[in-house]
UniProtKB/Swiss-Prot annotation:
Compartment(s) where it occurs, according to its Swiss-Prot or TrEMBL record: Cytoplasm
Entry keyword annotation includes Cell membrane: no
Listed EC numbers: 2.1.1.228
Main localization, broad class: cytoplasm
Family: Belongs to the RNA methyltransferase TrmD family.
Subunit and partners: Homodimer.
S-S bridge residues: none
Protein name listed in UniProt: tRNA (guanine-N(1)-)-methyltransferase
InterPro entries, per the entry: Alpha/beta_knot_MTases (IPR029028), tRNA_m1G_MeTrfase_C_sf (IPR023148), tRNA_m1G_MeTrfase_TrmD (IPR002649), tRNA_m1G_MTases_N (IPR029026), tRNA_MeTrfase_TRMD/TRM10 (IPR016009)
A GO biological-process term: tRNA N1-guanine methylation
Residues binding S-adenosyl-L-methionine: 113, 137-142
GO cellular component, one term: cytosol
Primary role: Specifically methylates guanosine-37 in various tRNAs.
């Protein structure tokens, strides 16, 4: 996968040299290319922003540098057509399903906005040549798109073949399609079996794989109900077995996933 990142702070992305993502880059599994937006500015101060039309606080990123940057980066016709990602708090919520979908793309470009955002005409113009998506990592505002881009790139990259040492871990992640769809992962434990008087649940030491799978499913349901009841309401009732319904009833939820009346 090729990933181009356009930003006024290329150094923000040094974490992509670390851990499994850095190893994947060095082995050629991921081709990450950083671009300083100011390279496409020509005044003495390398200006990338200006005052907003219509008035109001803050500054807006100018369209000219963005247009030239995207033109030059996408000029490599042999690389195919990229998908442009605009991280913004006004975008669609980024989910694990989006990570799975985007991990199948051969080429992604991330445009990291700053200030009040990027002139809206940039996305309109780019959409004439490539798919464009606005994505949000949460209902809060950051100083720019760099942090969101790091989040999305890591979520996508870890799904690529060869990046993780154990591919089974992906299927057991929170929100993973299949048995973990719309569920968060339950508690995890490692050695020693007793630490400061706290014991690992005996079932995990039993070697009974079917029982362990059932325990993990139960704990995922309990933790999701406690921390993310909104996800429980999204569960397909047809996907719930008898034990699932019993667990939901234990934590105060009916089979229909609606809260039980007091």
């Amino acid at each position: 996968m090729r990933i181009d990142i356009i930003t006024i702070f290329p150094d923000y992305f040094t974490p992509l040299d670390l851990s499994l993502i850095g190893k994947a880059r060095r082995s050629g599994l991921i081709d990450v290319r950083l671009h300083d937006l100011r390279r496409w500015t020509y005044d003495r101060h390398h200006t990338v922003d200006d005052t907003p039309y219509g008035g109001g606080p803050g500054m807006v990123m100018k369209p000219e540098p963005w247009g030239e940057a995207l033109d030059e980066i996408t000029a490599d016709a042999d690389a195919g057509t990229p998908r442009l990602i605009l991280p913004t708090p006004s975008g669609l919520p980024f989910t694990q399903q989006d990570a799975v979908r985007l991990a199948k793309e051969p080429w992604l470009i991330f445009a990291c906005g700053r200030y009040e955002g990027i002139d809206a005409r940039v996305a309109v113009d780019a959409a004439q040549r490539m798919p464009v998506e606005e994505l949000s990592i949460g209902d809060y505002v950051l100083n720019g798109g760099e942090v969101a881009t790091l989040v999305i790139v890591e979520a996508i990259s870890r799904l690529l073949p060869g990046v993780l040492g154990n591919v089974e871990s992906i299927t057991q992640d929170s929100f993973a399609p299949g048995t973990m769809d719309n569920l968060v992962e339950g508690p995890v434990y490692t050695k020693p079996p007793v630490w400061r008087g706290h014991e690992v649940p005996p079932i995990l030491l039993s070697g009974h794989h079917a029982a362990i799978d059932r325990w993990r499913r139960d704990e995922a349901l309990r933790k999701t109900a406690r921390n993310r009841p909104d996800l429980i309401r999204r569960l397909d009732p047809e996907s719930l077995d008898k034990r699932d319904r019993e667990v939901l009833a234990e934590v105060g939820l009916q089979e229909t996933s609606e809260p039980v009346a007091d």
